[in-house]
Regions:
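A general structural detector for well-ordered alpha-helical segments in enzyme core domains, enriched
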Residues: 7-10, 37-41, 63, 101-105, ...
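Amphipathic, soluble alpha/beta structural segments
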Residues: 21, 38, 42, 46, ...
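Short alpha-helix boundary/capping motifs
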Residues: 73-74, 95-96, 137, 212-213, ...
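Catalytic cores of alpha/beta
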Residues: 60-69, 115, 125-141, 200-210
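Auxiliary Fe-S-binding modules of radical SAM enzymes
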Residues: 133, 143-254
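Core AdoMet radical
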Residues: 1-10, 14-109, 115-119, 125, ...
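Alpha-helix N-cap and loop-to-helix initiation/capping positions
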Residues: 2, 33, 37, 93-101, ...
Length: 254
């Protein structure tokens, strides 16, 4: 875990790359990353970035309201799978096992004042077509209820996980991923669609011309990876597109 001084250095290092938006991530344990700790990180980030997004554990509306006051604008929650039976087999303990609480996190974030929310299933955990459909309907229904809210989709699929070679994705290859992204674009034409660095350069270069509206750049998934020579903790997943912010910018311009 980074302290306030280390967070400041990390934010400075990221801002120096030219990025104007930042995503703050934590694990699923409030004991490791309290709401107050995340709020402090948001206050620091606000000095350097125009938009602050959160990928953190689900919270109550009052906690989202506090983080919004600290500077957070956007909340993304990965439902992982919308198959509640499958979900139970993946989460045997802790707060994350409560399926409805996670499912309703985006609405609580909107009620807490967040200007936008993001949706995603981890494609490949279960039937990816059913999960993609459920993700789309989840976002659509919230958009109807809260028309002022900005809606975004992320499209992660199971990829190689560091220190784990037993994951067996259920056939979510690039053609299927493209189909899902295009379906989101047609179904909700004003939604944002983000493609992460888990996907390869070629796919990201092409999808930005077809349907995606946002791609990450200069990503380092190690804790303190932008500002420290020796990162704290392990990386979570492998990066397929390791290009810098300048390289991504040049690709988009070209």
């Amino acid at each position: 875990q980074l302290n306030a001084e280390e967070i400041e250095k990390e934010m400075q290092a990221i801002a120096e790359t030219g990025l104007e938006e930042v995503l703050i991530l934590t694990g699923e344990s409030p004991n490791k990353s309290s709401v107050e700790y995340i709020g402090e990180a948001c206050k620091i980030a606000k000095k350097y970035f125009k938009l602050i997004g959160l990928e953190v554990y689900p919270m109550d509306s009052k906690d989202y309201a506090y983080l919004h006051e600290c500077g957070a604008d956007f909340v993304t929650v990965f439902q992982e799978t919308y198959n509640s039976d499958k979900y139970k087999t993946l989460h045997l303990g802790g707060r994350k096992r409560i399926f409805p609480y996670r499912l309703n996190a985006q609405e609580r974030a909107i009620m807490g004042g967040m200007r936008g929310v993001g949706f995603a299933a981890l494609l490949g955990l279960d039937d990816f077509r059913k999960d993609a459909l459920a993700t789309g309907m989840h976002a659509y229904l919230l958009q109807k209820k809260y028309p002022h809210a900005e809606i975004a989709f992320s499209c992660p699929r199971l990829r190689p996980i560091i220190n784990n070679d037993k994951i067996n994705p259920k056939d979510v290859h690039e053609p299927q991923l493209l189909q899902i992204i295009c379906a989101y674009r047609i179904f909700m034409p004003f939604a944002s669609i983000t493609i992460s660095t888990r996907e390869c350069e070629r796919f990201r270069d092409n999808i930005i011309q077809i349907a995606a509206t946002k791609i990450s750049a200069g990503v380092n998934v190690g804790i303190g990876g932008h500002s420290q020579e020796e990162e704290k903790g392990d990386e979570q997943f492998e990066i397929s597109d390791g290009r810098s912010v300048d390289e991504i910018y040049q690709m988009i311009e070209d």
